[in-house]
Amino acid sequence: MIERRLTRSTVVRGGLALAAGGTALAAWPRETISARSAKQDAEILKFALVVEDLQSAFYAAALDKGALDGELLEYAQVVAEHEKAHADHIRTALGSDAPVAPNFDFGDSVGSPESFATTAIKLEDLGLSAYNGAAPGLTSGALADAARIVSVEARHISWIRDIVGKIPAPRPTDKAISAKQAQAAIQATGFVR
């Protein structure tokens, strides 16, 4: 058994490490968030619905194309159900304020197992990052709902990364992006018509 001795130098080093960690955490970039409100929740949920509709339509298109088999097919079938359930849940929460789903065209991104997997990773990462970026602006009730969805989104990205032989969780934390960044990323896909 290794014995640890508490010396003045270990206490000082520990205190310096703690102070440095606190300074680094204080420097963590934060977006300015307006006061949380039900109205802001609705705006965030409207955008989350676009992300979920995009993902849901992508998996449906991939299944319709019929280019998948084995583990990728199983992944697409399971995740298609999840994404549809997420979109339905948000649509129900928004009620009559829910926007109509945009039209999407996924072109060659669903034409082969490789292009499907590459696109799935990008879309799942986008969704996860968008939820993480929106979280600070949500009221506690909406945040709890979003947490139940984002935890599943994290499983999706880990699963598809594992299928293609990538590290399932390559970073100790997931990135967060602003709504503007997420909107730009969605437009950059070229999938929205």
Model segments located where?
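All-alpha RGS (Regulator of G-protein Signaling) helical domain and cognate RGS-like helical scaffolds
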Residues: I2-L6, R13-R193
